[in-house]
Amino acid sequence: MKYIVWDLETDHSATDWCSILEIGCILLDSNFKEEQRFQARCRLPDDRVPTATALCINRTNVDLLTKSNLSHYQLINQIEKLFKFWSKDQPTTFIAYSGINFDSEVIRKEFFKSLKDPYIENTNGNQRHDALNVVRAAFALDEKILNCELNEKGNISMKLESLARLNGFDAKDSHSALVDTENTCNVLGLIKQKQPNLWNHYLKTASKQTVESIMKSENLFTVTEYFYGRSRLFLTAPLHPKNFNHPVYKWAQVVDLRFDCEKLFALSYSELKEKMKESPKFLRTIRSNKAPIILDPSYAMKVDPYNKLDPALLRKRAELIKNNEKFANDVCNILQENAEEKMQTQSQEDPEPEETIYTGFASPKDKFLFTKWHEADWKDKLAMLDKFEDNRHAYFGSRILFNEAPEILPKDMYKKIKRKVAERILSTNKEKWTTVNDFYVDCDNLREDDNKMFSFKTKDEKLKFLDGINDYVMNLELKYQDA
């Protein structure tokens, strides 16, 4: 098994709408020793507006936004080529810090919008993990595992910059992609060194299939969770093997063994439904596709409240839960009802194409066309747009052409796309994406807030930076005002 540790810097925090600005990644061998590294940056396409805050965090100035050697499309192509090359010889685990909910989502959606297979991390034998999950589990078992500091709420700070700095690593250029990648490797390397017997256990759940296999084969185990600023251990038992997944989200459901399961079994269906609303919850969710940490039951048995209960009783409860198919069916039926009720209250607005990655896979025909489309020259790319079965793919292809080769677009098509971009970025409504007005408000607030210095050394330095990116967005606004 090899590892690719990686990090992205983007122009926004919303994964449906952000764009990759920079990537850093390091290939490591099975012993977690570096083999190769890669870093690249691209220009921001001018059909979208960045957030001022994101650019301040990763110090992306106007020159970096506009003068990098690579276009956005070229960078996405390079990332795909590199990831495929590095993982071609043997299965590879992709690891980012807090990556499951951000970096992985961004790369999936960027690939989706670039007419590529979005699931490069967890297909063809590859799997993905999250360094933050490992760090949280390591602290749950040993709060002294790494040097750390407390945050404003008095909890251990799990921020990568903080952990790297306090454990002797260079963190002064944090929020540049390669530095964050290096420090992810450094922090994980320390944990591997200090908890060698746990390292493989931390990483074994990098695939959904492995997690589901554990649910079917084991009666009880320790799971780690993080909430209210603390890592916690729970001793849990999975539901019956025939029905242990959430019926909608497909995440495993387990029962906290501090609860008397026989009392739960005795509840009527309506009583059970009410019980599932109570806190603390007897039912816990294991997000099977998000690299949960699952460990031997002995770890949770050492902590309160499980250490006050007879181990034989805990094992008996686990066996009863695992073998009660009716209870599992009732729980899953209630979860189904709850999910349907929630869906009825959600917005009925049609989603934008950028928000639809999880509404369906590309057809075999469109997947075949993806490769041909990327190999074609710009004029042939234009001619191929109407061959896609899925309108989303034609839409994304046209946006790539608008940004990369606008001169080959028919005038009517160019004007139509430009009007659509203008409607978005010049909107004065509250939108899901960043508008020009959103940017100006953000920029003005940052000018006035002396507490938000990011990594700028002086206020004058910050103001000069903000003036530069403000000019960039003003020019963008002028470009689209006549659309």
Labelled PLM ranges:
Residues 10-12, 100, 133, 183, ...:
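Short, glycine/acidic-enriched loop or turn micro-motifs at the edges of active sites
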Residues 32, 114-121:
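Short helix-capping segments at alpha-helix termini
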